[in-house]
């Protein structure tokens, strides 16, 4: 195939490449996908960033550790970071979590006892409803606290240029007039944003 728009990316490379906030990751071979589904240690070493519902972002790991130390939280509890206080209320009410310490942060935090089925249920619930704290908000917090040295700066295309490029490409791919292409948000919007 000549003039292909597809390139080979090594397993674990973020898509878009070199973007700490990427929501997709390269798994170029069928074996990579099988290893990921089976959660082999080798693949988990390679894939440190992926779709946030499936892989905890490195910034969230750093932030959870910081919150645990800042509030002197017992090791019997897992710090679970959420997108908002509204998310805290929803998760707390559903799973009867009523933290005994006051945590005052610009995002949601709950403490769930380690080694319990409740922790797994809470994490699954958060995964499916999308209550995860964003890596960009975590980055801002970590930078302000001096826990990371730099912030990843993302380049953005002009909105009209991006829209025209996408609709034109889709129109050609589907052999349709560009006016027939309509972009709408969906669960897969992260994939087309990555490409």
Spans of features found by a protein language model:
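Conserved N-terminal alpha-helix of the aminotransferase class I/II PLP-enzyme fold
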Residues: 1-189
């Amino acid at each position: 195939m000549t003039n292909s728009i597809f390139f080979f990316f090594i397993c674990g490379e973020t898509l878009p490449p070199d973007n700490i906030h990427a929501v997709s990751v390269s798994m170029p071979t069928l074996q990579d996908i099988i290893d990921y589904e089976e959660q082999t240690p080798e693949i988990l070493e390679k894939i440190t960033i992926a779709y946030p519902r499936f892989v905890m972002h490195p910034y969230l790991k750093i932030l959870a550790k910081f919150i645990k130390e800042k509030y002197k939280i017992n090791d019997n509890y897992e710090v679970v970071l959420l997108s908002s206080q509204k998310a805290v209320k929803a998760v707390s009410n559903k799973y009867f979590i009523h933290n005994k310490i006051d945590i005052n942060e610009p995002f949601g935090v709950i403490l769930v006892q380690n080694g319990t089925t409740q922790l797994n249920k809470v994490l699954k619930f958060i995964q499916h409803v999308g209550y995860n704290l964003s890596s960009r908000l975590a980055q801002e917090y970590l930078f302000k606290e001096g826990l990371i040295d730099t912030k990843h700066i993302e380049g953005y295309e002009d909105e009209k240029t991006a829209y025209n490029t996408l609709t034109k490409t889709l129109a050609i791919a589907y052999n349709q007039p560009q006016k027939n292409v309509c972009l709408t948000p969906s669960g897969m919007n992260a994939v087309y944003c990555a490409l």
